[in-house]
Amino acid sequence: MLQNTSTVYLSRLASPSLQRFLQSNGFQLNSLDVPAVYPEISTHADILLCQLGLWEKAQIFHGDPEKLARNYPGNIRYNAVCTGKYFIHNLQYTDSDLLAAAEAKAAADSTILTKIHVKQGYTRCSLLPVDDRSFITSDAGIAKSLACHDTDVLLIRPGHIHLPGFDYGFIGGTGGGLPLSGRRLLVVNGNIETHPDYKKIATFLEDRDIDLYYSKDRPLMDIGSILVDAAPKPLQQPVRD
């Protein structure tokens, strides 16, 4: 097994081959159970955790499960996207401690953090960050909000993603970016080749020098994002499994 100090947070429902791939590359896997929210999303990492920054600078903010409620909007307070340059969420419902942590990390990294308000409260579920300014989403409202800033957005067709208990899931919830062997890798849960916009997605990543790994043993499935902590210290006490 390769040496790696990074921890990956993902649902225990993630593809077995994806989990084996991550473990074989030395990532420590951590899954959550959040009984405060409804069962279909209770294993989703992005309901309780928020990744601040990308790649080698990624750090995990651990939310307080006692602040969460079963239904929307009480279950979205941590479901934000923070690339380091941008903090994207429905700011009406963002947890104040999360926002303060994002601002503190940006200051520590000598980065100016731009906050972008979107109507979609399940922001991380709906938005897959590719780099500091590049994103993939099927949500036209998010795409419109990001277009007002220095961003590149690939707007894909909605649907074609499995999510148990719902008609379909969302692209943000299928994956996440990891640093691996000096490269930047986007990992996706399930066979993304089945998505009708797969070729556009692959080209979007290739143009940004991002490698792609996906598991073909399962359908493309929203598992509540794949989040990585590449930093040596957590921002809060870690959540127990």
Give the label of every model feature segment.
Residues 1-241:
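Histidine/cysteine-enriched polar flanking segments
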